[in-house]
Amino acid sequence: MEINYELYLITDRRFLKGRQLKKVVEDAILGGVTIVQVREKDVSTREFYNVAKEVKEVTDYYKVPIIINDRLDIAQAIDASGVHLGQKDMHLNIAREILGKDKIIGISVGNVKEALEAQNNGADYLGIGTIFPTGSKKDVDAIIGIDGLSKIKDSISIPSVAIGGINKTNFKDVLKTGIEGISVISAILDEDDIKLAANNLLINK
């Protein structure tokens, strides 16, 4: 399955400002988002399931892959395209056994060692970061910058997306590294015009 990682949206309901998540995701896709990750922290399993199911109605309609952050059970329950796992989440090999070979598994990495390990273990793509300082993640160990991104990108052969503080003023510098895509939260969700915000992050619009 060929996946377009160019513009990777991660959901965060804290940025909704009273708007419906389904509508926000739809507008983002219409603006150019190519893949959506549903990320929910500190909510019940039932609530996460309901949110993910709601988003999947939109992604299915537009034939855009939907990735679930961390929770394999939710991914299975809604038949998501795959999961995204952090360094402290379930091991990739176990996740692959559970989900099977046809599902997408992405791994967050912050250095060359983690990247090579994830690639060797069969990750489908990597989320590389944190590139720039960001308010979305509080447990950031290290900002790697463009140089750190380039080093990791040059060490691997699988697709990757950059994450962390990427916005319309710096995304072109990130893409110059040859990375397959950028992953954003607030650069789209914190804007009033979601569709325009997404479109402003496309290199070939």
UniProtKB/Swiss-Prot annotation:
InterPro entries: Aldolase_TIM, ThiamineP_synth_sf, ThiamineP_synth_TenI, TMP_synthase. GO terms for molecular function: magnesium ion binding; thiamine-phosphate diphosphorylase activity. Binds 1 Mg(2+) ion per subunit. Condenses 4-methyl-5-(beta-hydroxyethyl)thiazole monophosphate (THZ-P) and 2-methyl-4-amino-5-hydroxymethyl pyrimidine pyrophosphate (HMP-PP) to form thiamine monophosphate (TMP). This is Thiamine-phosphate synthase. Pfam families: TMP-TENI. 2-[(2R,5Z)-2-carboxy-4-methylthiazol-5(2H)-ylidene]ethyl phosphate binds at residues 134-136, 165, 185-186. CDD domains: TMP_TenI (cd00564). It catalyses: 2-[(2R,5Z)-2-carboxy-4-methylthiazol-5(2H)-ylidene]ethyl phosphate + 4-amino-2-methyl-5-(diphosphooxymethyl)pyrimidine + 2 H(+) = thiamine phosphate + CO2 + diphosphate; 2-(2-carboxy-4-methylthiazol-5-yl)ethyl phosphate + 4-amino-2-methyl-5-(diphosphooxymethyl)pyrimidine + 2 H(+) = thiamine phosphate + CO2 + diphosphate; 4-methyl-5-(2-phosphooxyethyl)-thiazole + 4-amino-2-methyl-5-(diphosphooxymethyl)pyrimidine + H(+) = thiamine phosphate + diphosphate. The keyword Oxidoreductase does not apply. GO terms for biological process: thiamine biosynthetic process; thiamine diphosphate biosynthetic process. Its cofactor is Mg(2+). 4-amino-2-methyl-5-(diphosphooxymethyl)pyrimidine binds at residues 37-41, 69, 108, 137. Keywords: Magnesium, Metal-binding, Thiamine biosynthesis, Transferase.
